Amino acid sequence: SLVGSEMCIRDRTDSVAIRDEAQYYKGLNEGMLDGDAYIPAETDVSIRPSWFYHAEEDSRVKSVRELWDIYCTSVGRNSVLLLNFPPDRRGLIHSTDSLHAALLKQGIDETFSTNLLRGAKVKATNVRGAKYSPEKMLDNEKNTYFAGKDGEVKADIIFTLPKTIEFDCLMIEEVIELGHRTTKWSVEYTVDGKNWI
């Protein structure tokens, strides 16, 4: 589906799968958990106020903060982001446009380069077995993952950190090759080990 908002704000996270059959067209805008085709939504936006280059817009290029917000509300909600860079009269991308994009990339890399859970102890209430243990979430291996038992839809996963940390962003990924299976989650924390917030 196309996120048809020029503001590029995706208001929800949808399944990225659909049924590849004409009679299921209504699932195009939300996705279908039992879908058999991987079709993520596409969020299109221009780095400038319009889709084509106008010199008078050189001072109105989206700020790095605006681009970060767009990234979080598109890619962060399971959508592909198509960011338009209109070439100027020389056929080149304007230096302000490319600088803001480079700074966005730097911010993304800095935000997600450090796994704050590295060194944490992890346990789960529902584990399929040693091959799918919760420690697999922290091993940095793309071919390993945590899984709960078949037929059980809930698992509490608890990370115990060696020290208190502060963060303002969280990335949770699932093994998309197995389909979009996570439908609901929540994050809670405790400082004293007793009271969860």
Model-predicted regions and their roles:
Residues 1, 5-6, 10-151, 159, ...:
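Mature catalytic domains of secreted/periplasmic carbohydrate-active enzymes
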Residues 149-155, 164-165, 176-197:
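Trp- and acidic/polar-enriched beta-sheet ligand-binding modules for extracellular glycan
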Residues 170-171, 187:
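An aromatic-rich alpha-helical recognition segment common to small helix-rich domains
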